[in-house]
Each structure stands twice: as C-alpha cells, then as structure tokens.
Amino acid sequence: MPFRDLILFNLSKFLLTEDKESLEIVSSLCRGFEISYDDLITYFPDRKYHKYIYKVFEHVDLSEELSMEFHDTTLRDLVYLKLYKYSKCIRPCYKLGDNLKGIVVIKDRNIYIREANDDLIEYLLKEYTPQIYTYSNEHVPIAGSKLILCGFSQVTFMAYTTSHITTNKKVDVLVSKKCIDKLVDPINYQILQNLFDKGSGTINKILRKIFYSVTGGQTP
C-alpha cells in the first residue's frame, strides 16, 4: 500500500474532523518519509486547508510504531468521512395533504401500507386503484421502490439513496451508525461505488481514489 495514500487518508480525516490521532499519524509519516509542507499542498491546493496542514509540521508528539497498511475499518472510515456533515432534505409534495399519516411502499404494482390513517388509505385508493394495483400484507422491499412518507421528519440515508421518496412535509436525511454499517456490507458495493463517484473537490477526489484502492476497483 503506497505510504502516500496513508498520508492522504489520515490528512483528509484530520482536515474534516480535526482528529488528533490522524494528525499524529500524518506528522509521523511525513517526518519518516521526508514529506514537506510544499509536497502536501500540491495535493490540497485550496488555501482553506493550508493553515491546518501547517499544523502537521508543528506537531511534536510522534508515533513510535506505525502500520503501513490500512486497518480493517478503513472502508467504514471512508464512508463516514464521505458522509461527514452530510446535509440533505426532501421537500414536500403539496399534492399530499398535511392530514395524511403513514408509510407506503410501491414497487411495480405491489403496495405495502404501514401505520396509515384513514385519510392516507382514502388517497391511495383514489390514486392507485385496486383494479390495477395489489395491496399486499407482505413487506415490499424498499430498494427500487416508490416510498410515500406522511407525517415523518426524518428518513435514513439508505432509504433515500435506494428509493424514490415523496413526502407531505420537509424530511431530513439521516446518516446513522446503523446506516453506515449497512452501506459497508458487500451486497451494497454498487451503492458505495455510486456514492464515491459523485462529488468534486480535493477531499472527495482523494477519498474516491482510496476507496477504489481499498476495494480493489479501478478509479474512473
């Protein structure tokens, strides 16, 4: 594993989160491999980072032992950094009245309803006639479905990124520990690939490169 990737990963982590352990690792690696301030700013040309990069060379506490390999948790750390301070909301569809409450999952012609009040059921029967759609008691997978949320203020990032969501009020997209745990499951590799392929800027490009390095893929 190239030592520069270790430096760039830990430096990105420090720049995003001000993690002191990452600062110590970067400082130790730079001293050990004679990497200078000028070397680092070629990777981080944005001036907003420069005063933080300078701290790498001011840091006096160095690690006595350093691993030259990424840890087993690196993929999870990458996802955490990619979604760090993630902020997204879903605007309400004014076709859905404030009086509607419940969750509806629509996939193909199958409809699964949960916690719905009478107003939502009445709306569904008008919009999705039983002559065409099947109202099922069995759970319908969210992935690839249309999701109608009524009366909720939050939705998970996993649901947001795998379904088309319509809501009757402003909904914040939530990134939780449980969500990150699901994302790093090998079955969700395509979701991760789409996530890391998006975004511009210095740190996004570095995280993308390291993601493909860690997972064995090829950077697009």
Swiss-Prot record:
It comes from the Viruses. Pfam families: Chordopox_G2. Keywords: Early protein, Elongation factor, Protein biosynthesis. Transmembrane segments: none annotated. Signal peptide: none annotated. Involved in postreplicative transcription elongation on intermediate and late genes. Belongs to the orthopoxvirus OPG087 family. Interacts with H5 and A18. Might be part of a transcription complex composed at least of OPG087, OPG145, and OPG110. This is Late transcription elongation factor OPG087. It comes from Variola virus (isolate Human/India/Ind3/1967).
